[in-house]
Amino acid sequence: MLGDGNEGMSTLPGLNQIQFEGFCRFIDRGLPEGLFKFPKIEDTDQEIEFQLFVETYQLLEPLINEKDAVYESLTYSAELYVSAGLIWKSSRDIQEQTIFVGNIPLMNSLGTSIVNGIYRIVINQILQSPGIYYRSELDPSGISVYTGTIISDWGGRLELEIDRKARIWARVSRKQKISILVLSSAMGSNLSEILENVCYPEIFVSFLNDKDKKKIGSKENAILEFYRQFACVGGDPVFSESLCKELQKKFFQQRCELGRIGRRNMNQKLNLDIPQNNTFLLPRDILTAADHLIGMKFGMGILDDINHLKNKRIRSVADLLQDQFGLALVRLENMVRGTICGAIRHKLIPTPQNLVTSTPLTTTYESFFGLHPLSQVLDQTNPLTQIVHGRKLSYLGPGGLTGRTASFRIRDIHPSHYGRICPIDTSEGINVGLIGSLAIHARIGSWGSIESPFYEISERSKRIRMLYLSPSRDEYYMVATGNSLALNRDIQEEQTVPARYRQEFLTIAWEQVHLRSIFPFQYFSIGASLIPFIEHNDANRALMSSNMQRQAVPLSQSEKCIVGTGLERQVALDSGVSAIAEHEGNIIYTNTDRIFLFGNGDTLSIPLTIYQRSNKNTCMHQKPQVRRGKCIKKGQILADGAATVDGELALGKNVLVAYMPWEGYNSEDAVLINERLVYEDIYTSFHIRKYEIQTHMTSYGSERITNKIPHLEAHLLRNLDKNGIVILGSWVETGDILVGKLTPQMAKESSYSPEDRLLRAILGIQVSTSKETCLKLPTGGRGRVIDVRWIQKKGGSSYNPETIRIYILQKREIKVGDKVAGRHGNKGIVSKILSRQDMPYLQDGRPVDMVFNPLGVPSRMNVGQIFECSLGLAGGMLERHYRITPFDERYEQEASRKLVFSELYEASKQTSNPWIFEPEYPGKSKIFDGRTGNSFKQPAIMGKPYILKLIHQVDDKIHGRSSGHYALVTQQPLRGRAKQGGQRVGEMEVWALEGFGVAHILQEMLTYKSDHIKTRQEVLGTTIIGGTIPKPTDAPESFRLLVRELRSLAMELNHFLVSEKNFRIHRKEA
């Protein structure tokens, strides 16, 4: 569909616009539509009627702001009020009241919702669009079988197929098929109407005998025959109203409701003129679809490409919220109907307010945001992550595909994705190709299709007009890519340009072009658009880079990149992490947590985010960037947020890197780093962890928060205040008590001390006992307490426990085991931190900061990192920043290389450092060994790329276990750091040990130390004292488990021990 034309050049749309438009569509259209569908409800005697007066519904603004909702773990929602009336039919009296229907979670300025204090976001889902699709398959004998699949709005399917005898069937399941004549008659058509409305009546008459004519002689007979075949019922069922209701519920409602989009698709595909408001499948649809199926069999018509985006629709946040709203209203209807009947039965006088409660709507939305697979916790690792999360497209979820069953063809890139879905950005692993990302300029149309903008090329008009095309329309135009400069009207000579037409790529004269792309980034997502020189990288590495940029941790001292693409400012602006001036005025005062702005005669106080925890435990913090007395304009940046500098995205650091081997410490993607990165806090990041504890009412009394905890050392309680809560600002170590809590419990007589027994015997005093259930700081949690929150829910009952939350700030320098990465998929683990004097150094004496392995470049084909590295060196010397759009080879051949070499040459001239650009090996330089002072044999590439520190840090992953819990069934150590699990000796580890012939070590690891219950208890003592581990006489537990599993299959397995002396077989029971 062609969108409205916009004259002039295009601008980058708001990156959160997809979420905003969806939520506004729900509020403006979905909410009233759902309320208008609410039926009138009558009691059983039909004396009282309840109805909603939808015209006067109201949505009230929330009573709390977003910050308080997060602080108190509440939902940021609006209250929905609707006028309702009770009508007594006998007297025609009306009682009208405004009722509170429930709370609807609102969307904030970031495109997210706050539910129970947690930022959540709803993902857009890609589903098969309702309508009819024709395909051809080969049967076992090699003959083509043509089928037409009708997909309903609910996802139900009805297949029409034609067999060898030209008989047409409607298949309702794999084993059940029904004659199309029976189906059409059951839907209300008689035989004469069927034959009048089809193009090939002779085919329909050919397989109709006298018995079949009797079956469809009347509508009742057709319904009975349809029910007999559909439900596989034997005998002669009797026509009744309940039988029709069962068919309506099990078949017609699931498979025949097309919806608004399905009706439009059916009309277009079958050339029908049925009104749009008729959203159910009609006999005319069935018969016309059968005519098309017959035409397909005889070579007329085109089969459908099921993976084309014109056959898909986007289930946006508006559709999901509207579905949940309809579900809540159905529950409300059932509740009102039951309440009215109960009130009449007990002879009570109901009122509208008594009949309606807010529970159905509120609980429906809370369960949706908390449990639905498409409602996810917002990833707040960095500003880029927040934006990209809201632009994801998923084939998974209810009604969609699964990672186990999706085929390769569905996951693959399709030509219709051009300018709509990024061909680069997708998840890695089992969901590859099933979770994608919207292209930058793409938008979701009113019919659920993804539209992409193009410039119209017209010889008649000199004006540039921008059109938004849906996937079903752009294949009829010659579309030139935005990489070509031959579309300039000033170029008179005839030139050929690459173009796309009907999913094929052609080379045509530029006069034949109808449309052209508007931007080189048009077909990329945000993550891929931030990769400089992406055209020089392999697509797999570009995919890794776009994913790893979302894992970058905000650093304490952010720095914007020397080499970028120009989108960094837009991403930082739309992420909402920076403070933006909403009015113009003058700055009158600034401090760390607030900015005061005087404008329009008022003084505005703008609060700043100070050390706030994100959902990924990173630190969100804003730093003022304006000074007192400065004049500010509307839209100007007042404060930078996490990972932003001067309003631009700043995820990493520009560091000096050399590509060369160094003593094997950077082999296999390992990275050697300079100690300067540690001591100067180059890659230092802050992380905030949340620890919470609740107080409950037990059967022996309520739990108490106190600082008087018996049987604990005073050293562990040193940070508690008089209330038993850790003091704000204190430094805590592993094992320290954060909150002191005692839980009452029943004491046994044997547990009393002699003093307690004496008090009970003499004075009759009942000594209360309690168990220590304090909140202790777990391993790896050391840091500074920056916030303490004591949340007391209203009511104070046992069902609303008090919650105490402790927030601890950790300062993490880069260390061995941390993961670092560039923007080209070049990732590695820090293997060694070398002193500055031992690091390789350049000809001007500067030691490099990192040493990468040069072998990681050619095999991975991500040469873009070399261009960025060299250009970053030139920019660092010249104090310049570069913003380069991709595919700059459209200007001339080797444009990237020429740009890099020219900047290196200029840097060497201006700084009088000829080693920066040496004609014999441009981009390389001689590097000296810091330990000996001698130069390395070969010159190496060195420069200043942009390197990120990722959230995969060794502090979160390192784990050790001496002994711990074992699985109950296999008696093997548990798996995972969270469960204090043990090491896994897998196949490859066994192969490595087998290669060295260490049979005894293998036996110990696989049996004695793992799942042999008796022997593993003796291993520790034997290891300490010395000696050999005694050989067990029975089998390990995993072998015993295997024996029992085989016994469950009626197979008996015995094992035997062979004596070395006489080789006699002694039978041992397993």
From Swiss-Prot:
Q: Which UniProt keywords apply?
A: Chloroplast, DNA-directed RNA polymerase, Nucleotidyltransferase, Plastid, Transcription, Transferase
The UniProt entry, under InterPro entries, shows: DNA-dir_RNA_pol_bsu_ext_1_sf, DNA-dir_RNA_pol_su2, DNA-dir_RNAP_su2_dom, DNA-dir_RNAP_su2_hyb_sf, RNA_pol_bsu_bac, RNA_pol_bsu_CS, RNA_pol_Rpb2_2, RNA_pol_Rpb2_2_sf
* PROSITE patterns in the record: RNA_POL_BETA (PS01166)
Which HAMAP family does this UniProt record tie to the protein? RNApol_bact_RpoB
- Taxonomic path: Eukaryota, Viridiplantae, Streptophyta, Embryophyta, Tracheophyta
User: What is the similarity comment for this entry?
Assistant: Belongs to the RNA polymerase beta chain family.
Q: Which CDD domains match?
A: RNA_pol_B_RPB2
Description of how the protein assembles with itself and partners: In plastids the minimal PEP RNA polymerase catalytic core is composed of four subunits: alpha, beta, beta', and beta''. When a (nuclear-encoded) sigma factor is associated with the core the holoenzyme is formed, which can initiate transcription.
Question: Which reaction does this enzyme catalyse, per its entry?
Answer: RNA(n) + a ribonucleoside 5'-triphosphate = RNA(n+1) + diphosphate
Function text? DNA-dependent RNA polymerase catalyzes the transcription of DNA into RNA using the four ribonucleoside triphosphates as substrates.
Give the Enzyme Commission number: 2.7.7.6
Q: Where in the cell is it found?
A: Plastid, Chloroplast
- GO biological process, any: DNA-templated transcription
Per the record, GO CC terms? chloroplast; DNA-directed RNA polymerase complex; mitochondrion
Q: What is this protein called?
A: DNA-directed RNA polymerase subunit beta
Gene Ontology MF terms: DNA binding; DNA-directed RNA polymerase activity; ribonucleoside binding
